[in-house]
Regions:
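Glycine-rich beta->alpha junctions and the first turn(s) of the following alpha-helix
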Residues: 1-97, 172, 206-211
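A general structural signal for short secondary-structure junctions and capping/turn motifs
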Residues: 2-6, 133, 164, 177
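Flexible loop/turn segments at secondary-structure boundaries
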Residues: 5, 21, 111-112, 182
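Active-site lining segments that contact anionic ligands and/or coordinate catalytic metals
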Residues: 9, 58, 91, 111, ...
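Short, well-ordered loop/turn and helix-capping segments at boundaries between secondary-structure elements
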Residues: 15, 19-20, 41, 67, ...
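Glycine-rich phosphate/cofactor-binding loops in nucleotide/flavin-utilizing enzymes
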Residues: 29-51, 140-211
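C-terminal helix-coil-helix/basic helical segment that borders enzyme active sites and/or dimer interfaces
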Residues: 74, 78-81, 92-154
Length: 211
């Protein structure tokens, strides 16, 4: 189980599998290039959406703010408005960046732009739902993981709650490539920075020394 009470992931092990030559995807020995292309498309799917302005996670934040702002003192409300304004600007910058990336990717060859969107959206989602938890205060501690309530068909009672979204957002910087991996990609492929030292770069996988 995940911290949300969901079970979204599993491992599959295949033994003695042989792939017919006619089913080879891409060039023989070029599997990594195919895998990287797949990952680029996944990252675009995870972080490259172009929603309408003010929708998605930022809409959740605005809704809970409108609902709870009256319970805050003037100083706390002022601090919250500053934090909300900053996140709204980031959300709009991400939306427009994704729009430009989508236009650039219509050539059919996804580039590192997907890593930009994935990195920004993952970290922004976490910041948004962290702020939501700050707004609701101690109520944030009352979420039940719902192991016995998740019916296994994706219709868990908790899926629409802010507390569920906060817990689920913790995975955003891991799935589809960690934020650390995204920064490496952007540093090396976009900014042209020197790559990490790799002593196994020109060694076949089967020949890489293992403990």
């Amino acid at each position: 189980y995940q911290i949300t009470g969901d079970t979204e992931f599993n491992e599959i092990f295949l033994s003695d599998v042989r792939i017919p030559h006619e089913n080879v995807f891409g060039d023989v020995g070029g599997g990594w290039a195919a895998a990287v292309t797949t990952l680029m498309n996944e990252r675009v799917a995870l972080g490259g959406g172009v929603p309408k302005q003010g929708t998605g996670p930022i809409a959740d934040l605005m809704h809970i703010w409108e609902e709870r702002k009256g319970s805050l003192d003037d100083v706390s409300a002022s601090v919250m408005r500053d934090r909300i304004s900053e996140l709204w600007i980031q959300a709009e910058a991400l939306r427009l960046t994704n729009w430009r990336a989508r236009e650039a990717s219509k050539s059919g060859n996804p580039g590192p732009e997907g890593s930009v969107g994935k990195l920004m959206s993952a970290e922004m989602n976490q910041k948004i739902y962290e702020l939501c938890m700050d707004i609701i205060g101690p109520e944030a501690l009352t979420f039940e993981a719902g192991y016995e309530r998740n019916r296994g068909d994706g219709s868990s009672w908790a899926r629409s709650s802010l507390k569920y979204s906060f817990l689920r957002s913790r995975a955003n910087t891991i799935e589809g490539g960690t934020s650390e991996v995204m920064r490496n990609i952007l540093g090396e492929r976009v900014l042209g920075l020197p790559g990490d030292v790799r002593v196994d770069k020109d060694i076949n996988w089967v020949d890489v020394p293992r403990n």
